[in-house]
Amino acid sequence: MKKSTLTFLLFFPILLMAQSDKKVTADFLQSFADAFNAHDVKAIMSHMTDECVFEASAGPDIDGEKFTGQEQVKKAFAYIFAIFPDAHWGNAQHFISDNRGLSEWIFTGTKSDGTKVEVTGCDVFTFKDGKIAIKNSYRKNRMTTK
């Protein structure tokens, strides 16, 4: 057996353990929230896995509308910013337990027709390798005002 093959076989399990040992912190989730408030889709996506899933709070399915993979999720987030040019998620609080997390927030935004929205909501996260694998969003449904 070649020395390089033996070295690989000996250290590959250690490499796998190191990769799966990445922990998400509250600072990481705050950085994610800051990227949303900056409407910085590139920064947002850097927090998510390549095979990420975004389950929107509204849509035709029981779990809202589901977007899978970096491209679909990126387009979904860009669409939110187009609908709500002043979208903001404030008063964020983050909670983490193992590979799951929760962020509570107050969403405010104004649609292009002048409709104002202010609702509480939360994101339920599943983490993988130190990034967000699933972002499942929930928010209150409230009468809107102009």
Regions found by a protein language model. Give the residues of each.
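Bacterial Sec-dependent N-terminal signal peptides
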Residues: M1-D21
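Short, surface-exposed coil-to-beta transition loops
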Residues: H88-W89, E104, V117-D123
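A short hydrophobic beta-strand element
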Residues: D98-F107
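A solvent-exposed, acidic/Ser-Thr-rich amphipathic alpha-helical stretch
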Residues: S46-A92
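Short beta-strand edge/turn micro-motifs at domain boundaries
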Residues: T120-M143
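Short, cysteine-centered beta-strand-loop-beta hairpins and adjacent loop/turn segments enriched
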Residues: I83, T108-E118
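Residue-level signal for well-ordered, solvent-exposed loop/turn and beta-edge residues enriched
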Residues: V53, T115, K131-A133
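Short, low-complexity N-terminal intrinsically disordered segments enriched in polar/charged residues
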Residues: L16-S46, Q70
